[in-house]
């Protein structure tokens, strides 16, 4: 496997595209605020001593404890709730606000699972860590996003856990441990649908654990207002759409992804190119379409 294929993408930060994407991520500001301070602390461990001397006239003992945090953030929750998109935008925002121009964002590819050859997955993960560390060098900042983290970080104690899986988890844990030497310049954001299946040793290392849930009634209505502006819908119609995408009988509520990647295209295909999109196009589809099944921890 070539170097580039270990990652789905490697991009320099900040990116204007990610900055613009913040505007369509419903609830991004509140999510950013909830993790900003702690993430900022994690990313700027090298400045703790100066901060302590400035405001406490000495180095507080807890500075060392905080500086020893593992540079691992876990975003967990049901499928389609915006974990990966939020991780990318938060990484971009942190870099932009810190004015750290020399930064890179890596997205680990699921291809690191390899083809099943003995030792392949561990080797590919080791290669990925090496590339991230090389990119960080002596001064750069690097942020690694691992999507579908449960596919390579499941508990080693599971009955169906194979030797290859255990090696991969060991490699992942060792990699996170080694990243502490960068003093916060390299951080891993692991996204997973199922927090409960992650290896306990990895979960214990997480400095931040943030849960993502399916949007509630108010959030769904806000989403429709954001996305369907210009259609001339009434307040009542927005509320009907929000109610129609809610939990009912044995079906869960719709996810952000369900609405944006399934409902909208299906509705537009009914109208394009001969007429305008209508409220009825959406409502009729909601009678026959179903939300994605729950994939997270129950």
Swiss-Prot record:
- What PROSITE patterns does the database record attribute to this sequence? AAA (PS00674)
Q: Which InterPro entries match?
A: 26S_Proteasome_ATPase, AAA+_ATPase, ATPase_AAA_core, ATPase_AAA_CS, P-loop_NTPase
Please give the Pfam families that the UniProt record associates with this protein.
AAA
Q: Any keyword Calcium?
A: no
Q: Name one GO biological process term.
A: defense response to virus
Q: Determine if ATP-binding is one of this entry's keywords.
A: yes
Which keywords does this chain's UniProt record carry? Antiviral defense, ATP-binding, Nucleotide-binding
GO terms assigned for molecular function: ATP binding; ATP hydrolysis activity
In which residues is ATP bound? 80-85, 204-205
Function, as annotated, reads:
Regulates complex assembly in a CBASS antivirus system. CBASS (cyclic oligonucleotide-based antiphage signaling system) provides immunity against bacteriophage. The CD-NTase protein synthesizes cyclic nucleotides in response to infection; these serve as specific second messenger signals. The signals activate a diverse range of effectors, leading to bacterial cell death and thus abortive phage infection. A type III CBASS system. Expression of this CBASS system (Cap18-Cap6-Cap7-CdnC-CapW-Cap17) in a susceptible E.coli (strain MG1655) confers resistance to bacteriophage P1.
The record's note on quaternary structure and interaction partners says: Homohexamer, forms a 1:1:6 CdnC:Cap7:Cap6 complex.
Similarity section: Belongs to the AAA ATPase family.
Q: What is this protein called?
A: CD-NTase-associated protein 6
Q: Which organism is it from?
A: Escherichia coli (strain KTE188)
